[in-house]
């Protein structure tokens, strides 16, 4: 077999493969054996029909065509390996020459991974926010902690914002009560705004036992979207009584004996949170910088697939929450054209980021050890409510395990870039990022640019497999037949 490669674009190549007829003999023999088992010919037992009889009954050309179809996947795979083609899509195969006894010539056009010219890592620089925790932020956290330990005390006064009230609710439309729109003894925090629009304004100032009626739009039920009159009756008013901010509170609310120690711990935790946010900010800005500096073409087929995957996930999520695309776009304040353009842009960035990080993985020979993989498996298994071994088996059945490994590898590549990049704060002071020693579980889960899809969707797997040996890549899609294909079922002739 002879294979030659022609570069059509930075992301697409054309393979021309020439195969002598003798090299097709194993596939031809296998086709005869298969047909001998399938075809029933009077006077011959199943599996014992001679090739010459099959030629007479089915036609030599039909049999040759089926043999070629059998041989194409392996021939294509060998050509991919020989030419070191890093395939990213199923090939478009065209048989250009074939005759009985003559050579087989076919072409295969396929999308490939583009070459990525990485910049010097030391030339990379990002600016992040400094880790600053103010006294006001510390006191805000202490206030939230006090709020958690607050006691509700009954009061004899009108309702105020921040009170907790017990409410009886009823509603009517067109003068008729709405079935199912009644509630008794409902506990509600006034001012939270999480119950009915207009309720807060209506009951502020009401006394215990007083009823207030207001008009609002129904958001659910058979009459959703209609105007209704809602009556709210106050059945009790309580206010929050906050504990004193002193050493006794520190002892009650924490493991510390003094308020100063508690305040110091709160500050320390806030600083740690800011450092974690700083790492996330550096990751995001570094990826943005790389996308601006590195030219990475994206195959059209890959971009279309990523957009389709994102649209599918969105449709599934909208269905789960009981809404549709039009309503969702209305909440975003976007037209369909604006939203589609945004999806296309983010999808392209996701793929380009993958290509860049994968190039770093290759350039630096980044690997993954068993411990890193198991940490991820255990964490995600717990999050899914499954035993780790069961979750691992589910991953292994599809492409999930390789996608998970690719996630970890790309995170390690990104951390390597951050370790070598110049990181400063807004005033130009050097910043030492608090990078973990190894990728934390789901460290990149919210990083859209990294292109991670935790349902196993991945564009280019760097979990150590050979792209040329990929089953999906090695099987030509809809290869044109030289003649009519032979049926694979049993036949009576």
Swiss-Prot record:
InterPro entries: PPIase_dom_sf, PPIase_FKBP_dom, Trig_fac, Trigger_fac_C, Trigger_fac_C_sf, Trigger_fac_ribosome-bd_bac, Trigger_fac_ribosome-bd_sf, Trigger_fact/SurA_dom_sf. Involved in protein export. Acts as a chaperone by maintaining the newly synthesized protein in an open conformation. Functions as a peptidyl-prolyl cis-trans isomerase. Residues 474-485 have a biased composition (Low complexity). PROSITE patterns: FKBP_PPIASE. Keywords: Cell cycle, Cell division, Chaperone, Cytoplasm, Isomerase, Rotamase. Residues 449-470 have a biased composition (Basic and acidic residues). Its EC number is 5.2.1.8. One of its GO terms (molecular function) is peptidyl-prolyl cis-trans isomerase activity. Residues 162-243 form the PPIase FKBP-type domain. Consists of 3 domains; the N-terminus binds the ribosome, the middle domain has PPIase activity, while the C-terminus has intrinsic chaperone activity on its own. Residues 432-493 are annotated as: Disordered. Belongs to the FKBP-type PPIase family. Tig subfamily. It comes from the Bacteria. This is Trigger factor. It is an enzyme of class 5 (isomerase). Pfam families: FKBP_C, Trigger_C, Trigger_N. The lineage of its organism: Bacteria, Bacillati, Actinomycetota, Actinomycetes, Frankiales. Gene3D superfamilies: 3.10.50.40, Trigger factor ribosome-binding domain, Trigger factor, C-terminal domain. One of its GO terms (cellular component) is cytoplasm. Signal peptide: none annotated. HAMAP family: Trigger_factor_Tig. PANTHER family: TRIGGER FACTOR CHAPERONE AND PEPTIDYL-PROLYL CIS/TRANS ISOMERASE, TRIGGER FACTOR-LIKE PROTEIN TIG, CHLOROPLASTIC. It is found in: Cytoplasm. It catalyses: [protein]-peptidylproline (omega=180) = [protein]-peptidylproline (omega=0). One of its GO terms (biological process) is protein unfolding.
